[in-house]
Amino acid sequence: MFRKHFRRKPATSSSLESTIESADSLGMSKKTATKRQRPRHRVPKIATLPSTIRDCRSLKSACNLIALILILLVHKISAAGNFELEILEISNTNSHLLNGYCCGMPAELRATKTIGCSPCTTAFRLCLKEYQTTEQGASISTGCSFGNATTKILGGSSFVLSDPGVGAIVLPFTFRWTKSFTLILQALDMYNTSYPDAERLIEETSYSGVILPSPEWKTLDHIGRNARITYRVRVQCAVTYYNTTCTTFCRPRDDQFGHYACGSEGQKLCLNGWQGVNCEEAICKAGCDPVHGKCDRPGECECRPGWRGPLCNECMVYPGCKHGSCNGSAWKCVCDTNWGGILCDQDLNFCGTHEPCKHGGTCENTAPDKYRCTCAEGLSGEQCEIVEHPCATRPCRNGGTCTLKTSNRTQAQVYRTSHGRSNMGRPVRRSSSMRSLDHLRPEGQALNGSSSPGLVSLGSLQLQQQLAPDFTCDCAAGWTGPTCEINIDECAGGPCEHGGTCIDLIGGFRCECPPEWHGDVCQVDVNECEAPHSAGIAANALLTTTATAIIGSNLSSTALLAALTSAVASTSLAIGPCINAKECRNQPGSFACICKEGWGGVTCAENLDDCVGQCRNGATCIDLVNDYRCACASGFKGRDCETDIDECATSPCRNGGECVDMVGKFNCICPLGYSGSLCEEAKENCTPSPCLEGHCLNTPEGYYCHCPPDRAGKHCEQLRPLCSQPPCNEGCFANVSLATSATTTTTTTTTATTTRKMAKPSGLPCSGHGSCEMSDVGTFCKCHVGHTGTFCEHNLNECSPNPCRNGGICLDGDGDFTCECMSGWTGKRCSERATGCYAGQCQNGGTCMPGAPDKALQPHCRCAPGWTGLFCAEAIDQCRGQPCHNGGTCESGAGWFRCVCAQGFSGPDCRINVNECSPQPCQGGATCIDGIGGYSCICPPGRHGLRCEILLSDPKSACQNASNTISPYTALNRSQNWLDIALTGRTEDDENCNACVCENGTSRCTNLWCGLPNCYKVDPLSKSSNLSGVCKQHEVCVPALSETCLSSPCNVRGDCRALEPSRRVAPPRLPAKSSCWPNQAVVNENCARLTILLALERVGKGASVEGLCSLVRVLLAAQLIKKPASTFGQDPGMLMVLCDLKTGTNDTVELTVSSSKLNDPQLPVAVGLLGELLSFRQLNGIQRRKELELQHAKLAALTSIVEVKLETARVADGSGHSLLIGVLCGVFIVLVGFSVFISLYWKQRLAYRTSSGMNLTPSLDALRHEEEKSNNLQNEENLRRYTNPLKGSTSSLRAATGMELSLNPAPELAASAASSSALHRSQPLFPPCDFERELDSSTGLKQAHKRSSQILLHKTQNSDMRKNTVGSLDSPRKDFGKRSINCKSMPPSSGDEGSDVLATTVMV
């Protein structure tokens, strides 16, 4: 029954080469490999061989086939790596077992003691198996499919391992790492290993998750009922295995089979100087011709036959080629001009190459290497070498005329060739009459220099004279000599005068005169003063320079105008050679210039320097013509800057300040209470008053408290003592009244009574400014100097008039005064210049610098940093100039400032960008990208979230941070349809397309890649483009091509590209494989392609390809999130949607969909949803389409879709473990190989028996009949199995769009298809159709609604996957850039082989 299925086909060239290549890898010879491909009709020849030989050959072929299959199978499923676990800590404070008993006790005594237990003897056991959910439950009893191991005793009840390697468990694996796993870790008491594990169990923990091979550890912490265990795990591939499943094998090598190292992903990295798939091709020397050169070692350049040169780019001529070249082709002989023949050795232009005809004879080529000479009159011979008379050779040169001289003997002269014999064979003898023929000999050769006596050498000729006449030459003017060969030198006599140079000419001469003379022989004097008048070049240049210097100086407007006027007036037009002269006087051979004032030199072009010793006091002198100007330094004036400017003349000091004139400046001495450079600032130190009593006065040092008499101290805080003892108790007090006591006086004459009352004395006697004196009449006050009055209560004002000078402030005292002097003055009355500093003159740490009276320099303050002013009392604004960067706020004080930085920056001046990626906030091995005041995480496959904390394989990870049943990840779940999402105002760079929702403790994620980040996105804080931190250090931000903008203007966007060592920009970092990028996608089970035709006139402003792609991702995510989790199975891959303009078009977008996981069940679901989303029927509910396009520009890109074409591969139902599939396939192939072997063996046995006379025809016919019946049934079954690869999406597409999926052939085709199985294979599976080529803008929408559009799904029979074509729909005649596809009847396919590619075309 296997005979039909394994029937051999004629071997094509490609299959034969692949078979031979496989044979080479197994060490088989090409002969053996070729033998297995021979056609079947040659098999009967084997029957004639002995049976033993036939059996051996069949056995050897079968063994080779089985060995090839097994080697390929082993290579397919080979993998290697280690699962590693290290114990970090265990805490068992009670030393209890999990059952509550104590560690280290016999079973019969455990019930007697539960506290104060002995320490445990702790070891750990690891069980590793396939992934199991919590509902399934993880237990060691069900087996450890990935392996198990036990550590040695690590310690007591509680311990922390400083060296985690002590408690390490390593489980090697040789299968494809599944990424997901379940581990069970047990802590056991090793007191008595004979006890069952359940009685020795201290604690047990299990963990189920996903881990990718990496050198990084993942730490896990288990808090159990009895103990706490901290451990860490990781997976590492073996040394020569790579990628996430440890299945990529790469071993570095440097031998004849390859020269490469291994990359981080197992890719082969060629060593320096090698290239190719296996790096076995050497890179030749730079510039080595790739066709004509080769190399076995890097850097060499070995030429192939026929080529030479250091770079093998020089061809070699054919051997023996004489006058030819190879002309860019090896072993060629391309003849040069005038040469012919196979070896280019025949002269085709003998006349031009050799010039054989002498004496002006005309040469004519007659044949290769042949010629004929036509001689002039008087010449003859084969080469015109015979001279019949002397003038025939034109011996007279330079226009001379030859004349023959005859004599009495008129014998002719005969010229022969150089053989030296005449026609008669006699030699030629020299005579005196031959002296005129010397012109015929070569230069330097005498006539008697011939080798034979009596022979006259005439170059190649020899003369034989019998009776020869002579000739004479009549020379032209300027020539002389026997043959007019001598030029007469007319300059020999020196005809040129006054130093002129004589140049000899033919028949004359010419004199080149100096500039001062002219004439034929330079005899006439030139009048230089009569030269045409022209602008004085030197004067103009000087004028320009002078004007520039004047304008750049600090002259006043009046002085500036005068200087410019003087400079212009001093220049004039030139008089001949004199530029700035009064008169030009001609002299023999020369001239003299009478210069104007201020000018000198031969031509008066030099401006005399008038600035020597003129300007004073550091002024800058500007030299004019016969004049100068002084640009004075600051503080001086006058023509020579000799006068010091009195800056105090305008009284700049305010508020009564005294102005002190200085050099170039002034200084204000401010009165009490004022400060500043102009005394413009009032100093108020008495508000509020610091004096407790009395009144406050401002002083340069601060303030002064003028206290009342009974007070003393700086702030009048001290009380003066009172005098209460006699005799000071009365009479000396200003407040004594006459009613202090009562006295009655009685006289004899009257009876009146007088009463005097005296008040009790109080205060100081004599008001404290005098002494109380006693006298006969009573007490009185003797006042101190400066006071007066009965009780010395009046203070004499010594400050009136003011005795203080130079602005000093007078302070009245007790009988004296004090002068508070202004800065720079001192003395009792402030009349002396101060040379020293007084205490406290300079404030805030300033240093006082003494003055110098001889220089009128007063003491001044040198302020400390941060202070300024006359007394260093003014604080400098440290925040002036904005020292804080990046939006920082400056705060300052006296001599200091500090920056309060904005979020994301630090440092003293806020220039340091805070690295939010340190410490690492992203989880699960994600890549952290630092930003301004934040960070972003690029999650690895299988993770999502702001910090990649959501593990897609863990249903509860998205719900761990949620306080209720709905987590924060609900943005996409609340949208009812894709149109709602499109109208929410999302930007093109929205990264929320990949979101998770948490409902009732279970999470679901869209797991959709959101596109590359836009490195030209504007930062809301800095408002600057090219956001800092998006691109890494070795990357650059590459802006998107302008062609991707569908309708300008578009927002600027770009993506980060790696910068290669050659300074070239690498391709974008797309997660999808390059085989599924737009414009180069290969449609297969893991890659689908959609082609979208747009009407550009309906596309809204600002729409771009990436904007359309971002919108499609968001819309797809909104639909995927609604699907139940069971639709996608466990551990789905990441979906990737990529978009780009179709090559060569500007209105067609190619979109590819792929998954990071092979045979991902969500891929066909996503493709079906995209078909629904991009259908025009989805917009039926929009009543005002034009208004919607104006309001939402991004939707306009979708509403402008004219046609959608979808291509996908047929995806088989069901899924299984890839390792199991590989093993089952291997077993099946082995069984098939064994069956082939048995079949061949019995076939030969039957053939042998047939040849021996045995008749097996009935049984063979029956067997053939059964096989043909089985084949027909199989063909019918295959036809019935033909289904839509979009699976569930087809029904939803029909319900949502109202479109009919035509999955069966047309009725008329179906009827004919039932006639034979062959017709089933050749007829197309779709009816002919003819869509309109153009939709009218006004009626197109209605017609589209009325028309019953069809989505045609058909299997392309002749698709070529390598060229990325899909049958007849992608034929060269099809122009996808047009408005519609004209689906005519497709011709039947010519073959029954092809890849399973389905194409869907949607007309909208």
Swiss-Prot record:
Glycans are attached at N148, N192, N243, N327, N408, N448, N554, N735, N961, N973, N1000, N1026, N1146. The chain crosses the membrane at residues 1220-1245. It is found in: Membrane. Residues 1246-1404 are cytoplasmic. GO terms for cellular component: apical cortex; apical plasma membrane; axolemma; cell surface; plasma membrane. GO terms for molecular function: calcium ion binding; glycosphingolipid binding; Notch binding; receptor ligand activity. PROSITE patterns: ASX_HYDROXYL, DSL, EGF_1, EGF_2, EGF_3, EGF_CA. InterPro entries: DSL (IPR001774), EGF-like_Ca-bd_dom (IPR001881), EGF-like_CS (IPR013032), EGF-like_dom (IPR000742), EGF-type_Asp/Asn_hydroxyl_site (IPR000152), EGF_Ca-bd_CS (IPR018097), Growth_fac_rcpt_cys_sf (IPR009030), Jagged/Serrate (IPR026219). The modification Phosphoserine is found at S1292. Residues 1-10, 32-44 have a biased composition (Basic residues). Residues 1-79 form the signal peptide. Ubiquitinated by mind-bomb, leading to its endocytosis and subsequent degradation. Keywords: Developmental protein, Differentiation, Disulfide bond, EGF-like domain, Glycoprotein, Membrane, Phosphoprotein, Repeat, Signal, Transmembrane, Transmembrane helix, Ubl conjugation. Restricted exclusively to cells of ectodermal origin. Residues 11-22 have a biased composition (Polar residues). Residues 80-1219 are extracellular. GO terms for biological process: compound eye development; crystal cell differentiation; cuticle pattern formation; eye-antennal disc development; germ-line stem cell population maintenance; glial cell proliferation; imaginal disc-derived leg morphogenesis; imaginal disc-derived leg segmentation. Residues 280-313, 311-345, 347-385, 387-485, 487-523, 525-605, 607-642, 644-680, 682-717, 719-793, 795-831, 833-873, 875-911, 913-949 form the EGF-like domain. Disulfide bonds join C237-C246, C250-C262, C270-C279, C284-C295, C288-C301, C303-C312, C315-C326, C321-C333, C335-C344, C351-C363, C357-C373, C375-C384, C391-C402, C396-C473, C475-C484, C491-C502, C496-C511, C513-C522, C529-C584, C578-C593, C595-C604, C611-C621, C615-C630, C632-C641, C648-C659, C653-C668, C670-C679, C686-C696, C691-C705, C707-C716, C766-C781, C783-C792, C799-C810, C804-C819, C821-C830, C837-C848, C842-C861, C863-C872, C879-C890, C884-C899, C901-C910, C917-C928, C922-C937, C939-C948. Pfam families: DSL, EGF, EGF_DL_JAG, EGF_TEN, hEGF, MNNL. Gene3D superfamilies: 2.10.25.140, 2.60.40.3510, Laminin. Residues 1-44, 417-436, 1267-1287, 1360-1404 are annotated as: Disordered. Separation of neuroblasts from the ectoderm into the inner part of embryo is one of the first steps of CNS development in insects, this process is under control of the neurogenic genes. Acts as a ligand for Notch (N) receptor. Essential for proper ectodermal development. Serrate represents an element in a network of interacting molecules operating at the cell surface during the differentiation of certain tissues. This is Protein serrate. It comes from Drosophila melanogaster (Fruit fly). The gene is Ser.
